[in-house]
Amino acid sequence: MNQRAFQNSSTTATRELLYLRQAINVDVAIVGAGIVGLAHAYLAARAGHRVAVFERNPVPMGASLRNFGMIWPIGQSAGQLHRFALRSRTLWLEVLRQSKTRYRETGSIHAAYSEQEAAVAFEFSSKAPALGYDCEWLSPEQALACSHALVSEGLAGALWSPTEFTVDPRQLLSELPGFLSEQFGVTFYFNSPVQRVEPQKLKTPEFRCEAEHIVVAGGDDFQTLFPEHFRRSGVSRCKLQMMRTISQPEGWLLGPSLAFGLTFLHYPAFEICDSRAALKAHLEQTMPEFFRYGIHVLVSQSGNGQLTVGDSHEYGLDVSPFDDSAINDLILEYARARLKVPRLQIAEQWHGVYAWHSDHPWLFFTPCEGVRVLTVTRGNGMTMSFGLAEQTLLEMGVSL
């Protein structure tokens, strides 16, 4: 054998040996370390399964990072969606307590500042408890006693619910992988984009993995894995603009997370209200620019005291990478008229993008044996993640 042939043979053998060293064998492999992927990892690992998670970025960078951190059962449609949200809430609290990740059981207030908004809030408080919601109507005086962050002028009442709570997405996504690794032996492979998935196999540039069950939870990445399935589904994207204030004074707490009249038109839970039609007609006439950009305003507080304020909703596969300052101005104008906080100066602005489908709250594909693709398509992945993960794993035959 000449020297060149020997070198080529040696190089090939080294590569093959390296490839073998980088082979992974687990029970459950998960593509994506956003909250939906992490929920699958927690439930599978808690049940004693060997779990590996592959994330294309150094840290999760998608919708799970760029949101309010609200777990929001009050907004989910009555029936299956609301039941999933409540089950997800139970599992959320379990993992947060185990991991000692900071959260606040704040509840939520939908504050009404017009006769039409108050009518929807009151009607929902009358009908929803029979459908499994825990909520009640508050008079203006009761609402102000419950939240010192509301402007009193013009307040007509509010809808109170104790089921909502908040986490800081940045802290959560930073800490939860470490907890899963240390407590349950979950192995994380960051900077590891998955290039191909087959029955019981997946491949990255550096690793090959064999797993009895594979879950793909890639958010709005419709191009990398099984693009033909996404194409046929009619899935699209939603872009939302959000902001964070500077930190509030030490010790100042927002209390309940806040929503307002526009939110009654955004969340499907409120479709049970006959009075919603009159509110929609009123707001379309008086606030057309808010409808143009799909704006409704929510406010939550992070662990370091900052307030997260947003958001807008623009739809399409080709959502613009450029933000519109006029949208943020509208959000802040609306918030200032209803929100009484020490500091509303903005420290950060960004946009998030999530998968969207007008007909389905989530998409499930089984492109090949042992593989399940899951994408939440209504912007409620934080709320639904653990409930959906539990259902998905059970349907795949993973014992929990």
Predicted regions and their residues:
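Extreme N-terminal leader/targeting segments of oxidoreductases
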Residues: 1-26, 46
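Glycine-rich FAD pyrophosphate-binding loop
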Residues: 46-65
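Dinucleotide-binding Rossmann-like beta1-alpha1 core, especially the glycine-rich loop
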Residues: 68-146
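Helical element adjacent to the flavin cofactor pocket in flavoenzyme catalytic cores
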Residues: 158-200, 211-213
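Central helical "cap/lid" subdomain
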Residues: 208-273
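C-terminal catalytic lobe of FAD-dependent flavoproteins
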Residues: 294-296, 302-308, 314-400
